[in-house]
Amino acid sequence: METFVYLLFMVAVGALIGGVTNFIAIVMLFRPYEPMYVFGKRLPFTPGLIPKRRRELAEQLGKTVVEHLVTPEGLRRKLMDPSFTAEMAEWGREWLRKWLARKETPAELLERLGIRSPAERLEAMAAEQAERAYERWSETWRLRPIRDVLPAELKQTMEARVESLAGYLADRTLDYFRSEEGKQQISSMIERFFQERGMVGNMLQMLLGNVNFVDKVQAELGKFLRHAGTREVLSRLLWTEWNKWLDYPLATVEEMIGRRRIDEAVRSAARRLVQSGSWLHRPLDELIAPYEQPLFDRLIPQAAATVSCLLSDKIEAIVAQLGLADIVRDQVESFSLRRLEAIILSIARRELKMITYLGALLGGLIGAVQGVIGLWL
């Protein structure tokens, strides 16, 4: 019985010494926070290891984070992960929904961005940009023939209407000469004709009779205008003039109209385009409503994929510019020692307890061995 009690005592003493020793060693990692002095001499192991090496710990943590944890390669894999891209697209959709739900108008948005009187400024900006755009376009095309400037569809449409235009002109002319105004015009022309011939003209007028002669001329004009040959000649004339006009350089048209009038027309058209409708004062969700489905289904996912690719291509420069190692170091150095201790303990509390228990276990085993050796001797 005495032997058992002796061995048990040795095991208990060894376990106590081992456990307390490891516990003190763990505590000395953090405590004391400040160096301790006795008779002007600093006690060894003060301050604790972590307070003493906090700067080195902060620098090492920063390097570890950049070199092994938050690396450019890891960030690139995350950015190019389809699930992350899909999540980014969903973020974009959610943000856009919240933004549209505010019922903000373009005018309110521009004013919130610091742009006062947005309608007037947009009109002036649109007019200026339109004039500059026309000037650039004119510099490129003004010496080219009009046939090269006109869109092919417009040119085909105009050419297809030349034939019908000839018939239209003939019919309108025929309608005019059939009217009372046209008849009076014919009568006036005949009278001037006879008057210009002097006495001979007066004699002819007396013989023929003005009224009957007007009716005859009117009838002949009608036959002439209805004749297919007349319309064919008119069509050829229109084709000739059309092709001649197509060969003119654009500068000729500018000179005919006047550059100042063209500039004024362009600026006026740009202003009317901005003024057309009340879109500046309509909620953005109403303006975007017709395009909402393609915007949410295609444009936002494409934008998310594009942003991911751009960030992935520049990730090394971004990480270097951010200075993650410096951020981690500065953050760790800004922690109080008590908070730093709490952080480390929250991570490794279980392991530190196991180290204490392991010290007690080893101390108990050593005590048992010592007890056996003592009994043997």
From Swiss-Prot:
<dbReference type="Pfam" id="PF04286">
    <property type="entry name" value="DUF445"/>
</dbReference>
<dbReference type="InterPro" id="IPR007383">
    <property type="entry name" value="DUF445"/>
</dbReference>
<comment type="similarity">
    <text>Belongs to the UPF0754 family.</text>
</comment>
<protein>
    <recommendedName>
        <fullName>UPF0754 membrane protein GK0639</fullName>
    </recommendedName>
</protein>
<keyword id="KW-0472">Membrane</keyword>
<feature type="transmembrane region" description="Helical">
    <location>
        <begin position="7"/>
        <end position="27"/>
    </location>
</feature>
<keyword id="KW-0812">Transmembrane</keyword>
<dbReference type="InterPro" id="IPR016991">
    <property type="entry name" value="UCP032178"/>
</dbReference>
<dbReference type="GO" id="GO:0005886">
    <property type="term" value="C:plasma membrane"/>
</dbReference>
<feature type="transmembrane region" description="Helical">
    <location>
        <begin position="357"/>
        <end position="377"/>
    </location>
</feature>
<keyword id="KW-1133">Transmembrane helix</keyword>
<keyword id="KW-1003">Cell membrane</keyword>
